[in-house]
């Protein structure tokens, strides 16, 4: 999706800005919680989750947490699938674009795709269970999350990109307060958005071989190899 947006020669692709939706939830008095992708640490130099939480509260959010909380739930589900040993091949992907690629162009390998929700969905579900009636806004780098929200609306109510958050903060005069210390610690689930991060976060079973694939071309090659046996 990002590629289509960048290269479209007619400039026909337009990103949907979900900031008005997020603002609307806040303005009408909903309790709004932010699920922040762990890649924020790469997007914002010197930022930790406490600094991010403080800024988001100034915008009107009730609270904010890392999507990595959901990733911890997801990685446990992956480990259960491996422990059950019902599948000899398991495709794990938290990337909505890759999952859509499989559904549209590689339906033959769909049985191998782990039936596990994404970290964003898991975190959203957890927040909504803990705070009935709350709205959840995902904040991250990927525009395909907007489509994921549309397809699975029970978990998260809208998705913002970091660019949209930047514009909202600038418009509202909100800046990061770098005096906030991160008291949450790390956790292996923060590795999820990195290359091979899902595998790095898991407890490895020596009876299985683990491979990580990055990039659309390599993903397609790997899917074709699985399809062809």
Predicted region positions:
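Iron-sulfur-associated redox domains of electron-transfer enzymes in respiratory
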Residues: 16-229
């Amino acid at each position: 999706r990002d590629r289509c947006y960048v290269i479209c020669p007619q400039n026909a692709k337009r990103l949907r800005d979900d900031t008005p939706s997020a603002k609307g939830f806040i303005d009408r008095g909903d309790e709004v919680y932010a699920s922040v992708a762990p890649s924020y640490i790469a997007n914002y130099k010197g930022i930790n989750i406490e600094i991010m939480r403080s800024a988001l509260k100034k915008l009107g959010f009730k609270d904010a947490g890392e999507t990595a909380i959901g990733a911890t739930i997801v990685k446990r589900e992956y480990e259960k699938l491996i422990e059950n040993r019902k599948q000899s091949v398991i495709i794990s992907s938290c990337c909505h674009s890759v999952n859509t690629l499989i559904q549209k162009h590689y339906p033959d390998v769909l049985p191998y795709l782990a039936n596990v929700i994404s970290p964003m969905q898991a975190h959203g579900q957890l927040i909504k269970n803990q705070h009935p009636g709350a709205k959840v806004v995902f904040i991250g780098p990927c525009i395909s999350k907007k489509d994921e929200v549309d397809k699975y609306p029970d978990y998260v109510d809208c998705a913002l990109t970091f660019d949209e958050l930047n514009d909202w903060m600038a418009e509202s005069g909100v800046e990061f307060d770098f005096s906030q210390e991160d008291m949450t610690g790390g956790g292996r689930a923060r590795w999820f958005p990195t290359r091979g991060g899902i595998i790095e976060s898991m407890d490895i079973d020596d009876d299985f071989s683990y491979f990580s694939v990055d990039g659309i071309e390599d993903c397609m090659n790997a899917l074709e190899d699985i399809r062809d046996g």
